[in-house]
């Protein structure tokens, strides 16, 4: 089985867990929890600005290096 990563927070999702969401345009999004799904789809939040996501921490590291 292929381990997938969450489309919102960036965590790895073990096979048999998580949520697969298919948009109308055919894009497939994988979520590790309902929290991630609600933040991305329901609340339209961008992962770069949510503090508990991996993308936020990577961006923060880049800012502190410069």
Curated annotation (Swiss-Prot):
A cellular component term, taken from the record's GO annotations:
ribonucleoprotein complex
The protein's UniProt keywords, in alphabetical order, are: Metal-binding, Ribonucleoprotein, Ribosomal protein, RNA-binding, rRNA-binding, Zinc, Zinc-finger
Q: Which GO terms describe its biological process?
A: translation
Give the cofactor note text.
Binds 1 zinc ion per subunit.
Tell me which SUPFAM superfamilies the record gives. Answer: Glucocorticoid receptor-like (DNA-binding domain)
Checking InterPro entries in the record gives: L24e/L24_sf (IPR038630), Ribosomal_eL24 (IPR056366), Ribosomal_eL24-rel_arc (IPR055345), Ribosomal_eL24-rel_N (IPR000988), Ribosomal_eL24_CS (IPR023442), TRASH_dom (IPR011017)
Molecular function (GO) terms for this protein are: rRNA binding; structural constituent of ribosome; zinc ion binding
* Residue spans, zinc finger C4-type: 6-36
User: Record keywords: Ribosomal protein included?
Assistant: yes
- Cofactor(s) needed: Zn(2+)
> Residues that bind Zn(2+), according to the entry?
6, 9, 32, 36
Checking CDD domains in the record gives: Ribosomal_L24e_L24
Q: What does this protein do?
A: Binds to the 23S rRNA.
Q: Which NCBIfam families match?
A: PRK14891.1-1
Family to which the UniProt record says this protein belongs: Belongs to the eukaryotic ribosomal protein eL24 family.
Under the subunit heading, UniProt states: Part of the 50S ribosomal subunit. Forms a cluster with proteins L3 and L14.
Q: What is this protein called?
A: Large ribosomal subunit protein eL24
């Amino acid at each position: 089985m292929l381990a997938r990563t969450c489309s919102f927070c960036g965590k790895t999702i073990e096979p048999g867990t998580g949520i697969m969401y298919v948009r109308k345009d055919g894009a497939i999004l994988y979520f590790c929890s309902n929290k991630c799904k609600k933040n991305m789809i329901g609340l339209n939040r961008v992962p770069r600005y949510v503090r508990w996501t991996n993308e936020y921490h990577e961006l923060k590291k880049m800012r502190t290096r410069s």
